[in-house]
Every structure is written in structure tokens, then in C-alpha cells.
């Protein structure tokens, strides 16, 4: 099957098709958009940006949490169900004041995920401590590939979420921020990574793949990747572009016309190999955060990603009148 989407390898957002078989991404090929990438796609995006989606060795396969009497350095993360993981996050939030909790948004996440995280931080937790880790400059080929390797920094600017600065880091190191919620990003992109990780009392990671410091988390929530969700990114031209799901997860959001199914997938029998691909137990961040808000007594009222975007378009003047 192949599904129209965009590349998330840099700030350009080349239009592409995601080709999938056995629920595994097999290739990415360029899709014509004369305003963004014409007919082309760089080798970095075409060959590298999907590998983590298929990487069963590092994918987070289940919610996990640490037993309350086990230290960071002792390991102790164990599989649990979604309800228990969310209940643990809520329990930890209730232990702290709003200004003791920080949220790290992500320039790798959709506009919808970041918007709902921002609402949760400010409206539910009562925290203005939300920022994102800025991009690290990389190669710029002056044709397609941009130096900014994050696909949604402009989306964060639209939402008014600022890059992490020295003052924010100092508050972590000085333990003024006692609990940190990190969405779809890695502390490894910050300087003094180990020192920062050790300074956090409670760390909640909403991530798709494990990384070096993730074993220090209190709770790990499996995040769906860009190939498994609906959503939008804002590229370096300030062009709003959609991603669509091509890979199935255990809980799949389906909007009309958004999920391609090949002839083989559609007509495969239960004993056919192509019907047996791994479906990860991952959810989009906006959905999990909305559930947390509901547990805390506030209903955001979103049933799908499109409704989140409609709310964003109603509140952000630059997006007024836009829809899926």
C-alpha cells in the first residue's frame, strides 16, 4: 500500500508517499508539489527517516513505570497497562505545585500534539513552564535538505512555545522543576545531559523509541510515530502540511480517505504472512494527554485529530479558516 504524507527529516517537509507491506515501511518516494519539493526528495529523507519506525529493538512496546521505591540507577521499569501508567502520571502531578512541573514540547511532534500539551500544562496543571529543544544545525544542500532537521519548529512558534534557554535548564539543575514531562524528544540533545537527567525527581517520557537516558524515567508512554498518525507540520515556508497514517497500531484512528490498504492487505486470509505484521501499542500524544485531562476533571472534547486542528485554527489567527 502507499499513503500520501510528508517527510519529517528536516524543515522542508518534502511531499512523499509511504510504501508499506506487512505493516512495515518499505520505502519512501517523492510526490509532486511544485511549491515545496517539485518532483524530488533528498537521499537523507528517502533512506533514513523511516528506519526507527520499523526498529523493533528500540520501539517502546508497552507503557512502563518504575516501582515507587526503586531508584533511577537501579533499573526497575516494568510493563503495565495504559490505565495504570496514566494513573501513575496523574498521581505524581498531584504531588507537586504547578510551578514545580515542566513540560518539554517537541519540534518533531505534530501541531496537534504540541497544542494539547500546551493546553494541559497551562489550563490543567497550572504551569507556564513549557519549552522545546531547538534544532541542531546540520547539512544544508541548498536544494532540498534544510539545516534545521526538525519538521515543526515553525508550528511551535505559531503556538507561542519558546526554545529551551539557560534559565529553564538552570531550574532543572537547581531542582526547582521537580517533575518533567518530555514529549517525543531526547534529553541527549541537550548539553550536560547526564547532570540534567540526575536532577529530575520524576520524569515522564512520551516517546516512540528508547534512548540512552530513558531507563531513568519514572513512566514511559509509547508514542505513535509520524507514519502511524494524522496530524500537521508547519515547514520553513510557513506552509501547513498533513501527515497520514500508513502503518497500523493496535488502536488506529481512521479518518475518511486517510488510510491506504493494498489489495494484498485487504484480501489476505488470517494465515497469510502479510496480515501478521507487528502492530505497536502506541498512541498519539494528544490522545493520551486528553485522557489525563479527563481524569483530572477537565474534558477537552476531542474525538479525533481533525477536531484538535479545528480548535487550533479557531484560536491561532494565522491558521484561521483552515481545515483538514
Regions found by a protein language model. Give the residues of each.
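Cysteine-centered iron-sulfur cluster-binding motifs in ferredoxin-type domains/subunits
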Residues: 3-14, 41
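Glycine- and other small-residue-rich loops at beta-strand/loop junctions that grip anionic moieties
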Residues: 7, 106, 281
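Short, flexible loop/turn elements at secondary-structure junctions
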Residues: 11, 107, 184-186
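Cofactor-/ligand-binding subdomain signature composed of acidic, glycine-rich
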Residues: 19-99, 145, 157-159, 247, ...
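Conserved hydrophobic/aromatic pocket- or pore-lining residues that grip, position, or stack substrates
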Residues: 42, 103, 120
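Non-catalytic alpha/beta scaffold blocks inside enzyme catalytic domains
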Residues: 66-69, 80, 95-96, 113-114, ...
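Short glycine-rich phosphate-binding loop at a beta-alpha junction
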Residues: 100-106
